[in-house]
Amino acid sequence: MEETRIAFKKNFSINIDGLDLEAKEGEIGSIPRWLAQILEENNSIEIQDTDVLIYISRSLNRERISKPHDLSGIDLDFYIRANDFIKRLKDKEKESIVVSLNSFVTSRIEKIVKLAAASALSVDLEKKLSAEEKELYNFIHKYSLEFKQRAVNRYE
């Protein structure tokens, strides 16, 4: 479970399912993302976004410089983290990152389609994909195989 850096806005103490959390106002720490979202809604914490912006920027840059037939690695929860970050931005701030992410996604989809049409998902490639991309890869692979079989079987 991915953790998020946060700053506490007030003194805090909680025990949820064996997770003990105690902090004073102003302290900085890391907690599971799901808990951070709940506490942020209750105005108990502030999520530290700078780390996420750096993380997203690095991922975008790695993909941009990767070879046309190679996918750069991203974390399993990349899109979840990116979307959580975007939700907290003001409209003016969202525009440039959303444009960059759309370009990133388009590039990755093109590569995934080519790779999935050619072969099943390898262990090495699986490590480079997010959860959503794995699902897309397997979907494309399955249906491209079915299409190839139907297209070729017409002549037998």
Model region roles, listed by residue range:
Residues 51-156:
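Charge/polar-rich, low-complexity and marginally structured segments
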